[in-house]
Amino acid sequence: MLPQVLGKQRFDELIRFLMGRHRVVGPVAKPVEAVAGGGHSFETIADPSQLDMGYPLTILPPKKYFFPPYETLLSFGRDASGSHVEAPVQACPTAIVGMHPCDVYATWLLDDVFSRDVSDPHYLSRRDRALIIGLDCVKPCDEHAFCQDMGSLYVDTGYDLMLSDLGDRYYVDVGSERGRELVQTSGCFEPAAQDDHEKHAEHVRRKREGFANKISYDTKYLPQILDESYDSLLWDAASRGCFSCGACNLVCPTCYCFDVTDEVAMDLQTGRRRRSWDSCMLKSFAEVAGGENFREHRSARLRHRVFRKGKYMLEMFGKLGCVGCGRCDRHCPAKISILQIYQQLAVTPATATGR
C-alpha cells in the first residue's frame, strides 16, 4: 500500500477507534515521585491524552506485553475425579503505539527467538494479536543512544504502521496487511501527496544528519573483535564496580532468559508452573547442582553478556543482540557502559585474565 498521511488533529480519533477494538498501550509520562528522576513507561491508556508521543525512551521496553516479567504457564491439581492440568494461553488484542525503531527491531528479533525450533505459544499468541504502530526518530534519545552503530535506526519490517513526524501531520508507511486494514477501516488517513513525500525526504535527511556513529569501527567486525578479546584484562576492569544486580538485563529489549518454578499449595492438591525473567548477571545464574558455578566471577558474567549481544545472538539468529537503545547504560547503578566496552575493545590489548 502506498504511503499515507495522518493529520495530528485526527490522531486522537484514530486512538479512540483503536480503543474500541484493542487494549491500547503507549508511552506515558511518569511523575518524579513514581520514578526517580521521572521518565516514561509503556502503559495501557484510558484516554488518548495520556500518550506522550514526544518521549525520549521508556524505562522498560514494550517486550513486557509479549513476554511478561511473570506469567503462569499452567496450573495443575487433583480431586476425586483424578488429576488435571490446564495450560491456558492468555492474549487480548493489543495496539502498541509509539514504538521507536530500536524497539521494533528488538521485537522482530524476539519473534525469531520465540518461533524457532520449539515455538513458544504464550509469546506468539500475544504477538499474533498485537498491532504495532511505530514512531520514527529524528534525533537521538540522549547521549547513551547508539542505534546508528547497531543497525536498528532504520527498520523496514516488524511494524504494521510507521509514523514520521512532519509537524502538523504524520507520514505513514504501511508495513503489513493488518496495517492496511487499519488504514481502510478507520477513515483517519489520506494518501500522501507530493508535498508529503518531499517533507518526508527532508525528515530522512535530518535524521541521517542527527545521528552520528559513536563506535570507531564497523560493528560487522564486532564478533571478530570479541573473539580476539576473550582473555582481555578489560573484563576485570569493566566489571570491578558491578553489583550483579541484573538491571541491565531487566531493561534490555532483547534479553529473553527466564526461570521456571513450580509452586505447590500446602495441601498438595493444587499448584502452578510460573515463568519469570532471569538475568545472566546474577551470581547464581550459571550455578548447578553440587555448587559448581561456570561463571562465578563478575568479569566472566559481564563478558558473557557482551558476547551474547555482540556475537552469540548474531550466530544464532543472524542479528546483533544489541540494538543500541542505551537502556543498560542509563540504568546501571555502577555506570558500566556497554558502549564504552565496545569502543575499548578495539584499543585494549587482549591480555589474558587467567579466568
Question: Where are the language model's segments positioned?
Answer:
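General structural feature for long, well-ordered alpha-helical segments within catalytic domains
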Residues: 10-14, 248, 276, 337
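Active-site pocket-lining segments that scaffold enzyme catalytic pockets across diverse folds
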Residues: 254
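Iron-sulfur-associated redox domains of electron-transfer enzymes in respiratory
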Residues: 1-227
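Residue-level detector of anion-binding/catalytic polar loops
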Residues: 23-24, 248, 328
